[in-house]
Amino acid sequence: MAPRGRKRKAEAAVVAVAEKREKLANGGEGMEEATVVIEHCTSURVYGRNAAALSQALRLEAPELPVKVNPTKPRRGSFEVTLLRPDGSSAELWTGIKKGPPRKLKFPEPQEVVEELKKYLS
């Protein structure tokens, strides 16, 4: 039997993902204002409903602040809210990745995130 060759597709995929993240990070440097990013898993509708409710609450409290939902492909089981600042830094307002089961522990109350956002903006 012939020797098996090394798989090169996995290495290329890792490099492509790293380049994509770097490009997104560099693209974020030119922002003029802060942005709220909500990343949620797409495997279940519960994540989407909670993300929609949270984005609506954020838009009501800070209408001048843009809110993006899943700008990139989300991680499995994730629910994160991040504030991207104009200087390129980011502040995590909520992460539910390590929380649960039960799944409801992954989702914050919208008011908690709004209060956290106000702390970072002031």
UniProtKB/Swiss-Prot annotation:
Keywords: Acetylation, Redox-active center, Selenocysteine. The gene is SELENOH. This is Selenoprotein H. There is a cross-link at residues 41-44 (Cysteinyl-selenocysteine (Cys-Sec)). The modification N6-acetyllysine is found at residue 20. The lineage of its organism: Eukaryota, Metazoa, Chordata, Craniata, Vertebrata. GO terms for cellular component: Golgi apparatus. Transmembrane segments: none annotated. GO terms for molecular function: RNA binding. May be involved in a redox-related process. NCBIfam families: CXXU_selWTH. Belongs to the SelWTH family.
